[in-house]
From Swiss-Prot:
Alphabetic keyword roster: Cytoplasm, Exonuclease, Hydrolase, Magnesium, Metal-binding, Nuclease
Organism: Enterobacter sp. (strain 638)
Protein name: 3'-5' ssDNA/RNA exonuclease TatD
Phylogenetic placement of the source organism: Bacteria, Pseudomonadati, Pseudomonadota, Gammaproteobacteria, Enterobacterales
Family under the similarity heading: Belongs to the metallo-dependent hydrolases superfamily. TatD-type hydrolase family. TatD subfamily.
Gene3D superfamilies from the UniProt entry: Metal-dependent hydrolases
């Protein structure tokens, strides 16, 4: 199993990053993709990935930080993308739930990053919240120019999942699916996702699975808990855990072009 969404740059991991990574590998995680959410965090994620085995990173500007996007941002992403650790452009996309950056700023930054990914022939690591239709509209002209794309931390409806899958996207599933309050719809649509389009992630330190027993002493999520998420996904999909592990690992290799 491979965690495609770990925010290892988070201050919540500042005091024990080495231990967090070690616990993940001890728990059977085979690799980690460290998320870059703005230019500073993307540089930090690349540096962290450089320091650990079986770690890679993304480089991009999250919709929350889109107001910071400039021509210099593109130059920084080009530079980071040339490094061996960076295997995807992102996290980029749209978030109309909070609008920490205006919709206009978000759309400009998203489109610019899609263009960079297409030019560099790199996959895209994407975010979408409360912006499904506009997200697909902006993505559409670039679909055939991208080698692949994943919508990480998918929490949408069955119809939204089908529309994303019909456009060739991979879907990243987190511990949100373990939440008996908010995750029931996601749980029910899991069988809709073809095995060769499913990716798994923790989005740690966020989204600690609510159904872990015993509950961890800390509310901080960790990549070491990925196995619990995968176990639950396999159960709700009616699949064998080992088969799901093997398939999602193969999906990671295919999408990101990495070996682990």
């Amino acid at each position: 199993m491979f965690d495609i969404g770990l925010n290892l740059t988070s201050p919540q991991f500042a005091n024990d990053r080495d231990d967090v990574v070690a616990r993940a590998f001890a728990a059977g995680v085979k690799g980690l993709l460290l998320t870059g959410t703005n230019l500073h965090e993307s540089e930090h994620a690349q540096q962290l990935a450089q320091g650990y085995e079986r770690c890679w990173s993304t480089a991009g500007v999250h919709p929350h930080d889109s107001s910071q996007w400039t021509d210099e941002s593109a130059e920084t992403l080009y530079k980071l993308a040339k490094t061996e650790e960076v295997v995807a452009i992102g996290e980029c996309g749209l978030d109309f739930n909070r609008n920490f950056s205006t919709p206009v700023e978000q759309e400009a930054a998203f489109t610019a990053q899609l263009a960079i990914a297409a030019e560099l022939e790199m996959p895209v690591f994407m975010h979408c919240r409360d912006a499904h239709e506009r997200f697909l509209t902006l993505l559409e002209p670039w679909r055939d120019k991208l080698p692949g794309a994943v919508l990480h931390c998918f929490t949408g409806s069955r119809q939204e999942a089908v529309e994303c899958l019909n456009r060739g996207l991979y879907l990243g599933i987190t511990g949100w699916v373990c939440d008996e309050r908010r995750g029931l719809e996601l749980r029910e649509l899991l069988p809709v996702i073809p095995a060769d389009r499913l990716l798994v992630e923790t989005d740690a330190p966020y989204l600690l699975p609510r159904d872990m027993k015993p509950k961890p002493a800390s509310r901080r999520n960790e990549p070491a808990y990925l196995g619990h998420i995968v176990e639950r996904i396999a159960h709700w999909r009616g699949e064998e855990r080992q088969r799901l592990d093997a398939q999602t690992d193969e999906n990671v290799r295919r999408l990101f072009g990495i070996t682990f």
